[in-house]
Design a protein with these regions (language model features):
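Conserved alpha/beta-hydrolase "acid-adjacent" motif
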Residues: 271-277
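Conserved alpha/beta-hydrolase
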Residues: 123-143
């Protein structure tokens, strides 16, 4: 009798542990900090359908590299704030001659100060904009162990806006400009109290929610289209280890509260963050808005 009970129990336990292992691996891959790790040569076990911004195949490699080199040549001021959960966060401030406005740049997933926003930073600087390159938690020179897909980054963006406002003696208008996860964080931050000098938001290819983005990533990277159990496990690890729930990384409530104008734009062929995310954010937004796809 005992043997009959032990066998199915052992099978169920093995299945449970196997599923838990999958959930842990997914959490470790998408949420845990990978800064400083050396990539090992190994056989690919998943394929991405999108191309990196600086890949020669997309035609922007030269512009990308030139813009990044330009950023590295500029003299910038190191800036630091303490996040609401005690992390030391880093940014670089680039002043412009006769500045007319200040733009806070919020980079994307696993990005850093001089990544895919380098070209836009150069353009903004040449058009009389002071630029603050923030580095999100777990990226660049900022502290942190986990990427929270906007759940905590939204508060960091708010803190940076306050930091800039307190030092903005000329009361120049401030704009929040985010890309990908950075755009989602900017949109989420708009639901909180921001300085009066913040006059508008720019959201480049931002996602609408972490849960939706996880579904898209699972389908795109691993060809997994039905993952309710995996999402439950991921959320459990996020709560237990990283101190947030996936529902905390969602733009819906912020878009209902936001009163500042928002420019949404998205590449129609984006396969990393699908264009329907910007359309959803646009539809949720109750403030003055424009969508360009």
């Amino acid at each position: 009798m005992k043997k009959k009970l032990i066998r199915p129990f052992a099978i169920l336990l093995a299945v449970f542990l196997g599923l838990l292992e999958v959930g842990w691996r997914f959490f470790n891959m998408v949420v845990c900090c990978k800064r400083g790790e050396h990539k090992k040569e190994r056989k690919k076990w998943f394929e991405l359908s999108h191309i990196r911004e600086n890949h020669p195949r997309n035609g922007y490699a030269r512009v990308y590299n030139e813009s990044k080199a330009w950023c590295l040549e500029q003299k910038m001021q190191d800036c630091y704030i303490k996040s609401i959960d005690g992390l030391k966060l880093h940014a670089l401030y680039l002043p412009a001659e006769d500045a007319k406005r200040i733009v806070i740049l919020s980079h994307g997933y696993r990005g850093s100060r001089f990544g895919t926003l380098s070209f836009m930073a150069k353009y903004l600087h040449e058009h009389q904009c002071d630029v603050l390159f923030i580095e999100h938690r777990c990226c660049g020179d900022s502290e942190g162990k986990y990427i929270t897909f906007g759940a905590k980054e939204q508060w960091d963006v708010q803190q940076w806006a306050v930091y800039v406002s307190e030092r903005n003696k000329e009361k120049l208008p401030i704009y929040l400009y985010g890309q990908s996860m950075g755009a989602a964080a900017v949109l989420m931050a708009s639901g909180h109290t921001l300085p009066a000098e913040v006059k508008g938001l720019i959201a480049d290819c931002g996602f609408q929610s972490m849960e939706g983005q996880m579904r898209d990533m699972a389908a795109n990277w691993f060809h997994l289209h039905h993952i309710p159990l995996l999402l439950i496990e991921l959320d459990w690890f996020c709560s237990l280890l990283a101190g947030f729930h996936m529902k905390d990384a969602d733009t819906a409530e912020a878009m209902k509260k936001n009163t500042r104008p928002v420019l949404f734009f998205h590449g129609e062929k984006d396969t990393y963050v699908y264009p329907n995310n910007s359309f959803q954010n646009y539809m949720l937004c109750r403030a003055e808005k424009e969508l360009v796809i």
